[in-house]
A protein has these predicted regions:
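SF2 helicase/translocase NTPase motor core
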Residues: 1-136
């Protein structure tokens, strides 16, 4: 199982960028490790108590299968707890009531979650995965 020490120097720079830049974007090419880079930054932010509840917005397939599996593949992120907020409204509500580090929702349900929480937004950090798919 790979460890944090096996990340590339450019990934360490991206992690530092996320950590020091509250509103940022990572525009790195396909296969350059944006997911594990972001997960590592999330671990650092949780450890420093800068954030406690993270929402990741991703395409449905990615929301259901990528983030939690990638975290499980690395020594330093395997402890992260996830809740996948997809499916029927009943399933999404159940997923939101779990106590975890990271909630992952598909982009089609962004309006729903915003309406659901209204003025009591509980997330300290939002990650938009596949940002180019948010064209309008």
């Amino acid at each position: 199982m790979p460890s944090r020490e096996q990340l590339h120097k450019y990934q360490d720079r991206m992690i530092n960028f996320i950590y020091t830049t509250p509103k940022c974007a990572l525009w790195a090419g396909l296969g350059l490790g944006k997911t594990i880079t972001t997960l590592t930054a999330i671990v650092d932010l949780i450890d420093s108590m800068t954030v406690s509840k993270v929402l990741i917005v991703a395409p449905l397939r990615v929301a259901n299968s990528v983030w939690h599996k990638e975290a499980a593949n690395w020594q330093h992120t395997k402890h992260l707890k996830f809740s996948i907020v997809t499916g029927s409204e009943k399933e999404r509500l159940g997923a939101l009531h779990k106590t975890v580090d990271i909630y992952v929702i598909n982009r089609e349900n962004v309006h729903w979650i915003v309406d659901h929480y209204a003025k009591k937004w509980p997330f300290d950090m939002i990650v938009l995965d596949e940002a180019s798919s948010f064209k309008s």
